[in-house]
Amino acid sequence: MPSVLVIDDDLFVLATVGDVLRSAGYTVLTVQSPAEAFHLDLSGISAILCDYNMPEMNGSDVLVAMRELQECRAPFIFLTGHSDLDDLIPVAIRYGAELLPKPVDPTELTRLLRRQLAA
């Protein structure tokens, strides 16, 4: 069963996304900050969903750190309510990440995650 790490500073988003993914059959690990995520063993993580706008660091920085410093190659999906994506799109393209707008549509979330895991 694939394991998904969800990083978001909003407890409601963590609970909602976690419930959707568990209902779809995924094992879910949720953390409220990038610092918590960086202390995890990411080797068993199948995919990462990460909020873009967090106080500690933004999602682009999290993605770069995971790819370059932690050598984590799991598919990465940005969750964002941010309307100005000019700084996010180049990073997403460079690292092959996807974007999913908030509020998260459960059907779109599971479809996108299945597609990422199949790639």
What feature does the model see in each segment?
Residues 30-47:
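Acidic, metal-coordinating helix/loop segments flanking the phosphotransfer/catalytic sites
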Residues 54:
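Receiver (REC) domain active-site loop signature in two-component systems and cognate sites
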Residues 44, 70-76:
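His-Asp phosphorelay/catalytic-motif detector in bacterial-type signaling
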Residues 95, 104-113:
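C-terminal output helix
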Residues 15-19, 23:
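Charged docking surfaces used in two-component/phosphorelay signaling
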Residues 51, 80:
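Active-site residues of response regulator receiver
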Residues 10-14:
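Short acidic/polar segment at the start of the alpha1 helix of CheY-like receiver
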